[in-house]
Design a protein with these regions (language model features):
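PAPS-dependent sulfotransferase catalytic domain
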Residues: 1-158
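Phosphate-binding beta-loop-alpha motif at adenosine-nucleotide cofactor sites
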Residues: 151-177
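PAPS-dependent sulfotransferase catalytic core
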Residues: 190-191
Length: 191
């Protein structure tokens, strides 16, 4: 997707194009806000304001997140004026358990416990008492439902397994979805 929209020829040239897809929330977008980095979730007070600042140039941007589409306290994750839509990649929970156990070097039972934790969140674990990159994930099920049942944004749901087995067709669906959201009438180009 990054190469398709950010290069003239659509050729992916490695990590440079991946840098066009940033993560949100992330510390660099929250630097000018007064929050307590030692308190998990305190950055949520500024999620929408940070997005407004990101969008000041009125250009289309792509972001990735693990965040549930929920309010944290009284704080929305995003707003309609800040987000055109989303693409949610659903992965078979059995594969998520296996992937998590390898990534975090924990056993399958612990990985399943984390996936079912309604209060689950992530942040940069290498930083001590610095929750500036805090993302509220919740459980696998509630995270999925928060995006599936939302009335705020159009969301395109894709199966991770389909991305692997039917890459071209899924990619085409993604491009058509993005073009619709952005009123891009140029259509899908194979070239």
């Amino acid at each position: 997707i990054s190469a398709y929209y950010y290069t003239k020829n659509g050729i992916f040239l490695g990590d440079n194009h991946l840098k066009n897809v940033q993560q949100f929330p992330e510390k660099k977008y929250l630097e000018n806000f007064d929050y307590d980095l030692a308190i998990p979730g305190d950055t949520s007070r500024f999620w929408v304001l940070a997005q407004e600042k990101i969008n000041e140039d009125r250009k289309i941007k792509f972001f990735k997140t693990h965040n549930a589409l929920v309010k944290l306290g009284n704080n929305d994750f995003t707003s309609r004026s800040n987000s055109l839509g989303g693409i949610y990649i659903v992965r078979d929970p059995r594969n998520v358990v296996d992937s998590m156990s390898r990534h975090f070097q924990i056993n399958h039972d612990k990985a399943l416990e984390v996936m079912q934790d309604k209060k689950n969140f992530t942040y940069d674990f290498k930083k001590k008492k610095d929750y500036s990159d805090y993302q509220f994930i919740s459980s696998w099920e509630l995270n999925y439902q928060s995006w599936k049942n939302n009335n705020l944004l159009p969301i395109k749901f894709l199966k991770y397994e389909d991305l692997l087995s039917e890459t071209f067709f899924v990619f085409k669906e993604i491009i058509e979805f993005i073009n619709k959201l952005t009123n891009n009438k140029s259509g899908f180009s194979r070239e």
